[in-house]
């Protein structure tokens, strides 16, 4: 006998299962309809509860009493009356801080300085930096302006 094995020695087969058959029972009838019966009973009880609360609240309002707090949900009653907000609140008038925008063009308050016209023979303006015009991307040198890395 090998004491290290976890299976029992009686009825061992080659696949490690014992010779007895285990039947797993499934409570299918309960899961098929029993749970739905409980759910339907709970939903019916909630509907009945809300209906009774609505009847009680309607009777209380007919007698002039206040309804049960947080239960004024009966659908056949009219919604509460809405009161209009007072026009001037805190005795102040509201002023629009910005004037309305118009669609007409308005020139800036001061004219910008005039720029001298380009020469008529040249199509393009002169370069902003003369050094940039002297070199191009094709003449890029390896360490121009860059630190040597590694």
UniProtKB/Swiss-Prot annotation:
Q: Where is the composition biased (Low complexity)?
A: 1-19
GO CC terms, sorted: Golgi apparatus; intracellular membrane-bounded organelle; plasma membrane
Question: Which parts of this chain are annotated as the region Disordered?
Answer: 1-21, 85-131
> Coiled-coil ranges per the record?
none
A GO biological process this protein is involved in? endocytosis
Q: Which domain of life is it from?
A: Eukaryota
Q: Where is the composition biased (Pro residues)?
A: 106-115
Q: What are the recorded GO MF terms, alphabetically? A: protein-membrane adaptor activity
What's the protein called, per UniProt? Uncharacterized protein C19C7.05
- Give the species this sequence originates from: Schizosaccharomyces pombe (strain 972 / ATCC 24843) (Fission yeast)
Q: What is the lineage of its organism?
A: Eukaryota, Fungi, Dikarya, Ascomycota, Taphrinomycotina
